[in-house]
Amino acid sequence: ERVRLGVCIGEFHNKLMDRMLEDARVSAEAMGATIDKVVWVPGTYEAPLVVENMLQDPTLDACVVLGYIEKGSTLHGQEMGATFSIIAKQLELEYGKPVGMGIIGPGATAEQAEMRVAYAGNAVRASVRMAR
């Protein structure tokens, strides 16, 4: 039986995110999984509500979050990343479904982000393995 995935993806860095989504699709197909739902959100801060909705969806087996929290001049990105990680883990445990973390950063430069597009596939593979 195929694992059915939902993908929550940040739209702020849309060219990079398009490439990550494609990597996620290729990885899902290679694992015998399908991406049945994709929801674009403004950024990581907005992702938890979508993740919770996906985990509540009985047609989905797991959720994958894709994003990029870039290096900034303040600690805002680090705070967002840490907060989201905690919330995602709480939701995963509450609903008993995996949440794959394909978020680059926080604190990554544009060059580092380009080199980490494959984080999307890693998140898909981890989610599929945990859902099985």
Regions flagged by a language model, labelled:
Residues 36-46, 105:
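Short beta->alpha junction loops
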Residues 11-12, 68-69, 103-107:
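Short, ordered loop/turn segments at secondary-structure junctions
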Residues 4, 16, 20, 24, ...:
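General structural feature for long, well-ordered alpha-helical segments within catalytic domains
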Residues 46-87:
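Glycine-rich phosphate-binding loop
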Residues 1-40:
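Glycine-rich phosphate/diphosphate-binding loop of Rossmann-like nucleotide-binding domains
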Residues 14, 22, 26-33, 52-56, ...:
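Generic secondary-structure signature for well-ordered alpha-helical cores
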Residues 77-132:
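C-terminal binding/interaction regions
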Residues 38, 61-66, 98-104:
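Short beta-strand segments at enzyme active-site cores
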